[in-house]
Amino acid sequence: MNVIYFPLHIFVVYSRAYTSLVLVGCTNLCAVLFARCLDDHLVSLRMSGSRKEFDVKQILKIRWRWFGHQASSPNSTVDSQQGEFWNRGQTGANGGRKFLDPCSLQLPLASIGYRRSSQLDFQNSPSWPMASTSEVPAFEFTAEDCGGAHWLDRPEVDDGTSEEENESDSSSCRTSNSSQTLSSCHTMEPCTSDEFFQALNHAEQTFKKMENYLRHKQLCDVILVAGDRRIPAHRLVLSSVSDYFAAMFTNDVREARQEEIKMEGVEPNSLWSLIQYAYTGRLELKEDNIECLLSTACLLQLSQVVEACCKFLMKQLHPSNCLGIRSFADAQGCTDLHKVAHNYTMEHFMEVIRNQEFVLLPASEIAKLLASDDMNIPNEETILNALLTWVRHDLEQRRKDLSKLLAYIRLPLLAPQFLADMENNVLFRDDIECQKLIMEAMKYHLLPERRPMLQSPRTKPRKSTVGTLFAVGGMDSTKGATSIEKYDLRTNMWTPVANMNGRRLQFGVAVLDDKLYVVGGRDGLKTLNTVECYNPKTKTWSVMPPMSTHRHGLGVAVLEGPMYAVGGHDGWSYLNTVERWDPQARQWNFVATMSTPRSTVGVAVLSGKLYAVGGRDGSSCLKSVECFDPHTNKWTLCAQMSKRRGGVGVTTWNGLLYAIGGHDAPASNLTSRLSDCVERYDPKTDMWTAVASMSISRDAVGVCLLGDKLYAVGGYDGQAYLNTVEAYDPQTNEWTQVAPLCLGRAGACVVTVKL
């Protein structure tokens, strides 16, 4: 029997052979002794083999023997012990229960022995924490141990075993199954913390079981019929994977109640593969089944499968199949795949037009290709020849589509000689609409002064035909950039391509024979007269003969073959001299001087003349403009700009000269007044006109024409070197932001090269 003390003074007496007896409200030591006596009586009954019930009379007799006579005096040890047990039920000053300190007991409790109880004894008892399900230790105090009570493992009292031996064992203060010590303040309350169990691979194991059911056709509740194949499946699994089946089985539609569902237009093997995927999450992608899988996955709305199939097809793109993949993606509504296939077609158009897929395209697809601005082609003649190849492949059927498709060709951008040959071509000679288009292109060439009024989508060059924009050097946060970046109009990206051999500031760059000539400048210590040449095709540098004069802040441009170096500063004074590089003789020669010394000058070529715009002459910035005629070797003053501009960017478009950005401040003023305004010069009227301003002020801005737009690259806004770039459309008079530079820079030289 075990006697266990609860905080509310309740002793629970457990017996192996008989039902449990609960004594409620016992508050003195006699209750413990009574329980011991009762236990001894139960043992004697068990040893004698008696199985009679323990009746109420026996309980009352034992109670009378122990509780009916209070023989002890108030000063006796028992009374002291009773008082100690009574204090367990009293309330302390802090409102809590007082608990007995085992060290204060006067009566050695080691003489009171308890036996273990088996698990059977607890079947009808309240639930409470136990050290073991097989053994419940005794709770016992010893006179030697004042550190608290211990859980003791007591052997059962067997036949022939004396009580003294049991008591001796109980005083050993050892545990056989546990060495844990229970402190005197242990409340023995049940644990109330929550526990959560997470099964590993639960979903995987569940779907494996479902796959097993599918394999053995067990518990299937729907049959999918594709062609002559019947595929059993489980609605729950299909609905959990496919939005198509989820909508079918969870809504009030006819298929929700049918046991067999016909899948019209679905390839049976692809359907079976996707049903297996629903159970396993695995799918084999092969070239011979990828299109069927993708079309079926699109129908069943299996987004992950669609994405995987699209990525697979992206890896298979080739000039021989990109058009087919592009059309297939468009039919299936796979926008990402269509975009990638289209871009691949545009990038490799020269190879695509030599493959069979191109000549087999319908006229509608040919029209979509011809309308694109993104074709990677060297010139417009390439596209016209591709169109003629397509027409001749089935001349009788396709001749009627020729005039409609010819309208997508940018005929005004073809050479006049090419247009003359077209006019006499048998394919166009008898087609009135084709003749109209050819005449329109001829007028564009014959009447250059009317070109602003003849602008149309056919006069807009394709992106790949306009060349590549290069930004060379400039001032950056490290006090001098040597890197060169190029801008691709088709991808709208800047990419580093090369580095100069050394640092140059306030230098000039011009393009001659598709090569970049870097002229003059300063290296931070001295002004330079050196020239070096960069070949973008071979990505190599070569040293050229130097100028006669050291110059920084100069302007450089190519006019009718030779290259001109205009003005600048030689380290001592502002220059009005001009040198000309003869590429045939490979030498520099002086030409007529300008009327005004100019440094940080803007230089551009327009209508066979060289223009020097603004700059500074030492004391202040200039708003004067003069032009050089190479045939007369003279400089002539032109109309002045509305603003003084040093560090101005200039370029030309459609017979007009544009001056962009710059600063206006005297040399002694450290705070420059930066400009965002733009104005253009018409040489026919000798007048400047203001146009839309840039989004921000830009000093030392690089400006260049690319296609039909003017690009303002980098510059300085008074606080930072800019990496932003914006493009001006003269036809709409609007500026738009484009991709930024990789490196912020001011004073970069920006030129266009046709690669």
Swiss-Prot record:
Instruction: Show where the BTB domain sits.
Output: 220-287
Q: Could you tell me the Gene Ontology terms of the biological process aspect for this record?
A: proteasome-mediated ubiquitin-dependent protein catabolic process
- Acidic residues: compositionally biased ranges: 158-168
**Extent of Low complexity compositional bias:** 169-184
- PROSITE patterns membership: BTB (PS50097)
The reply on keyword Ion transport is no
SUPFAM superfamilies from the entry? Kelch motif (SSF117281), POZ domain (SSF54695)
Output this protein's name: Kelch-like protein 5
Gene from which this protein is expressed: KLHL5
